[in-house]
Structure formats: structure tokens, C-alpha cells
Amino acid sequence: LGIIFADLNGLKDMNDTFGHAKGDQLIIRAARLLQESFEDGLLYRIGGDEFIIVFEGMDQFRFRDYMDKESHIIEKDSIFVSLGWGWTKNSASRERAQLDAEQMMYHKKAEYYRTHDRRRSS
């Protein structure tokens, strides 16, 4: 069982600058981008700007090969999504895989903001 934890970058700025209606549109666009990028998985919105993509029946090596081809941040049309992933042999360990994915995603999100904030101030 492979799990990707995805979080939209910049939603707070969008909401603060343009309002929540524009922020909602950004969430919809991000969901479509994730569906297109990970069509082999099942996409779930777990709240706010966070999503999980679940890959059932995929062995560890295939999942890792699949993820090695992906970036830790998806960027398209001014949408930036930070990603983390985890894998487990059985669904009983799903929480562990989800936690691994979430921790990796937060690390990548912090990395994104360090780089993004540096570019802004230059």
C-alpha cells in the first residue's frame, strides 16, 4: 500500500489577498492536478488544502520506482503542491505509512518556503 500526502503551498496568501472564493478555486485546481499526476491512485481530500493519494495493490519496488520519477513538489500553472510518501506491506500498518508520508511532506514544504521566501526577498 503506497500513500502520498500532499499539501497545497500558498493557500493562506491566496485567501488573504484575493479572498476565500479564489482560495477554493485554487484547491479545486490542485485536486485536478493531483488526479492528473497520480491517475493510478485514489485521491482523497482530508481537509483544508491537504490530500492523500492511496495506491492499493502496488508492491514496494514499483511504488518506489514510481515515486523516484516524481518531484517532491508539483508545480503547474502557479500551483505548488508539496509531497511526501510512505509504503507498507499491509493495510494494518497504514497509519505508519501515512505518518511517514506526512512527515516527509512537511519537510519538503519547509524546504519550498525557504527557497520561495529567499527568491521573494532577492
What is the role of each PLM region?
Residues 1-2, 9-36, 44-48, 52-53, ...:
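Conserved long alpha-helical elements within nucleotide-processing catalytic cores of c-di-GMP signaling
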Residues 53-58, 87-89:
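Short beta-strand-to-loop capping motifs
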Residues 64-71, 86-120:
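Catalytic-core segments of nucleotide cyclases and related cyclic-nucleotide turnover enzymes
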Residues 82-84:
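PAS-family sensory domains
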